[in-house]
């Protein structure tokens, strides 16, 4: 609950101006509620209008994206780039291609990205972008033409010292490659650091593909060790999603001794009591781009349920939501607790509703919020930018070791900040406070633009 008058006034004004952007308001409210103890210690923030500036993006770019499909028909989509905050570095955040993309969702993601990037300790500001274009069902040539048209407008707003996008939902290595190629043609320059998630032959980083999923498990393992004197060993793990984050979270959780029994997509989920056959899922999703229900057709002990929301009714010790925002509501959280779940760490962005988070906290569940637990992807993007700047390529083991160190550092920064805020063990409060303080200090030092 917001009790600080200054923060309440800022939020109420924001809610009036952004009434049609519920995801953005949800993200802002969560942060403002968490940072109340910090703001009360710094009355100078109010005088400087710091919070008012923090919750408004520095810039929002909206543009049309015309492209020609394989039938020769002209299609038009809408493109966005939300450049949220550059206090600690150039804007950094992914591009999402999905029909659900709108300005409110991208503002929420850019706002979250600001604090997530701060937690990594790397010099990266917050941003997010994308389009309502749906790459599913499109040919490679259609995707290429769209990506080239998208970058033909976006290129004038980005650069390695200005704004450095990456991939996200619907934007993988194929799309990043097409966009990088178009940027190179338009600018007549090879700026490796202006776009991350690149192929290994033109400046990409080893371990980038695995980074978000691996990082999620490194964070979870460190939290288990330090807060519960426990580990993944022998634990039953439920994972939602079957994209990049879910696949590599499954791989690392299994490597650390857990047994992953579920994966899902937007149509439903599969349950395999023997543990998920990850090699099959990789081939299904990364090569054939098939649906998860095909898993049950080839694995006799597996069952398929045509409702992805029911994945949270499966008994487990650890839940790793890796699909999409607000996928766990109050009822799903209660089902998890009832069935023995004691740890929830988030691989997706804001996958738990505020009501679900209340259920976790009131039942003693170890809760790792997205901005801390899934920061491995952007952390490794930052490491990719470092390699590009050095004109070097690090080994998989070197990148993975740096990633592990960053994720363990994020846990400790979040835990220590939770103690300082009077909420020991509440990693949501801790992550918000730790991420906020670095950004706030930088903003105060850089002055106010009149």
Regions from the PLM with identified roles:
Residues 2-27, 223-224, 335-450:
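Adenosine-phosphate binding glycine-rich loop
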């Amino acid at each position: 609950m917001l009790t600080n008058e200054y923060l309440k006034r800022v939020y109420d004004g924001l809610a009036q101006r952004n009434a049609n952007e519920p995801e953005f308001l949800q993200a802002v409210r969560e942060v403002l509620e968490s940072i109340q103890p910090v703001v009360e210690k710094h009355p100078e923030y109010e005088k400087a209008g710091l919070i008012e500036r923090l919750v408004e993006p520095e810039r929002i770019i909206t543009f049309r994206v015309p492209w020609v499909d394989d039938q020769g028909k002209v299609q038009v989509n809408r493109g966005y780039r939300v450049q949220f905050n550059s206090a600690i570095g150039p804007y950094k955040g992914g591009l999402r291609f999905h029909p659900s993309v709108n300005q409110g969702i991208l503002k929420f993601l850019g706002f979250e990205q600001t604090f997530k990037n701060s937690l990594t300790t790397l010099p990266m500001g917050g941003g997010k972008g994308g389009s309502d274009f749906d790459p599913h069902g499109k040919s490679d040539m259609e995707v290429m033409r769209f990506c080239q048209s998208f970058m033909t407008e976006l290129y004038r707003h980005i650069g390695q010292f200005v704004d450095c996008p990456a991939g996200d939902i619907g934007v993988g290595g194929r799309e990043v490659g097409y966009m990088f190629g178009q940027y190179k043609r338009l600018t007549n320059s090879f700026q490796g650091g202006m776009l991350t998630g690149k192929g290994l032959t033109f400046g990409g980083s080893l371990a980038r593909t695995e980074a978000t999923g691996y990082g999620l498990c490194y964070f979870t393992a460190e939290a288990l060790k330090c807060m519960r004197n426990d580990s993944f060993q022998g634990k039953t793990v439920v994972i939602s999603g079957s994209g990049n984050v879910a696949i590599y979270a499954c791989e690392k959780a299994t490597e650390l001794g857990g047994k992953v029994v579920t994966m899902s997509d937007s149509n439903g989920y599969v349950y395999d009591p023997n543990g998920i056959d990850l090699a099959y899922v990789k081939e299904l999703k990364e090569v054939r781009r098939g649906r998860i229900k095909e898993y049950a057709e080839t694995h006799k002990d597996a069952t398929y349920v045509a409702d992805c929301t029911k994945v949270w009714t499966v008994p487990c010790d650890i839940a790793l939501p890796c699909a999409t925002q607000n996928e766990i509501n109050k009822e799903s959280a209660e089902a998890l607790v009832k069935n023995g779940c004691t740890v929830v760490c988030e691989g997706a962005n804001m996958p738990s509703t505020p009501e679900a988070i209340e259920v976790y906290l009131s039942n003693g569940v170890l809760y790792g919020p997205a901005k801390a637990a899934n920061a491995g992807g952007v952390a490794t993007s930052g490491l990719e930018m470092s390699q590009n700047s050095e004109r070097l390529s690090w080994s998989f083991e070197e990148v993975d070791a740096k990633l592990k160190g960053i994720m363990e550092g994020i846990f400790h920064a979040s835990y220590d900040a939770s103690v300082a805020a009077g909420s020991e063990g509440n990693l949501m409060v801790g992550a918000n406070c730790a991420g906020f303080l670095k950004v706030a200090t930088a903003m105060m030092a850089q002055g106010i633009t009149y």
